[in-house]
Amino acid sequence: MNYDERGFSQMEFKNINTMRKLNNGVKIPCVGYGTFRTPEDVAERAVADAIEVGYRHIDTAAVYGNEEAVGRGIKDAGINRKELFVTSKLWNTERGYESTKKALQDSLDRLGLDYLDLYLIHCPANEKQFGTDAKRLNAETWRAMEEMYHEGKIRAIGLSNFMPHHVAELMETAEIKPMVDQIEVHPGWPHTEEIKKLQSMDLLVEAWAPLGGQGSTVLKNETLQQIAARHHKSVAQVCLRWVLQQGVLPLPKSVHVSRMQQNTDFFDFELTPDEMKQISALRDLGVQCADPDEVDY
């Protein structure tokens, strides 16, 4: 995949359901609906609303505690399962060969689904917590993911919060190359070099918290406000466009229908190379995730 100065320009993105192709040929809508920190009592309605708005790519995780509600929201929407792309994630306490297999089935049961379109390892096991066992634990977990992929329970397998060195280490023993890596990407925490490295490894990068997340000052940033005014767009739409033009797949989250709709409306303008550089140079606007090499949960 080749990227020019403005980012991923070889594909014409028309709307949130323009398809990207993973390295195994599976197609994925270019924008997803995120459900991080969406409570169980809100998630059902929010997911149904998101599907009504037009989202076909839904992202959840076991640790979010809302898979059952997400599943009900999908059922409430009443559309064909094949029209949806559903992702969930394996939580850290379930790493390991047998526990990974059980965790997938538990997620499927909670969601009320027969298969997942994408299943991710939520975080890499690290040496700080597991010492020399970290590499073995990641390899065993991935072996279970590969087997479940071969069994047809998952259409694509990938990673979350893995940095390039984690991916390279995993690939030393992997039979199947990961298709996706979902990491924190937003103005103020751009991960520019990491994105380029992951893309060079033929992974599709997804962006969680593309609008900055809880406690971030991204949406109040003066530079972003000026760029947004120039394009007659909101700061959120500028952030999503900036992510998209890097060839990265954004996962915006809102439980409000008006904002869900706003987060789909960023396909009718393009950021200039200078604007892309300005945004990528922003720093210290709020980071959500701890260093994956330092976490101990």
Residue ranges and their predicted role:
Residues 56-64, 87, 155-158, 180-183:
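Short catalytic-loop micro-motif centered on adjacent basic/acidic residues
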Residues 2-84, 144, 211-212, 295-296:
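N-terminal binding-site loop/beta-alpha segment at the start of enzyme catalytic domains
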Residues 125-297:
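Beta/alpha (TIM)-barrel catalytic core signal, keyed to glycine-rich beta->alpha loops juxtaposed to Asp/Glu
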Residues 100-121, 147-151:
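CE4/NodB-like, metal-dependent polysaccharide N-deacetylase domain
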Residues 23, 71-81, 108-114, 171-174, ...:
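Acidic (Asp/Glu)-rich catalytic clusters
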Residues 81-94, 118-124, 184-185:
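A short, structured active-site edge motif that brings together acidic residues
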